[in-house]
Amino acid sequence: YEVTSPVPGDNVPIQLNNKGFFAWFEPICKLYMLPKYNELDLTPFFAPFFMVFFGLCLGDSGYGLFLFLGATLYRLFAKNISATMRPVLSLIQVLAASTFFCGLLTGTFFGANIYDIDLPFFQKMKETLFMDNNDMFQLSLILGVVQILFGMVLKAVNQGIQGGIKYAVAT
């Protein structure tokens, strides 16, 4: 056999090497597509957006609390959790926390509006956290624009890494 340096057309194996928080999102990135040998690993850039959008899509503090407690209890009481299951449980906890806090923005707990409860605690939360439909629409538009612009910048950086500055400027 012959050992050569990889060229752009080669199909070489890819090993993602993220640490800590970002490593938890690698299984999700692997579901879509691994980067090529000479491309950026987008996992660190993908993770925060996925976390926020997952929370906004599920958006119920009751579900978030349920998922968080379920993953935490499983982690505490299960014996011999496999090495592949630990990061999945951590990912569930992070996504559940995002869901819980996004549920506080909308004021839902298992589908019920918690801000209709006439208790001072919930009314204070409503004044500080609650977002009505217009606020949520504006937030989603802003997040969408930020994500698209950020993706375009990442594409330009990736093009610059692969082909040079003239390709980065052209994107």
Give, region by region, the residue ranges found by the protein language model.
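Conserved, carboxylate-rich catalytic/transport cores that coordinate ions
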Residues: Y1-T171
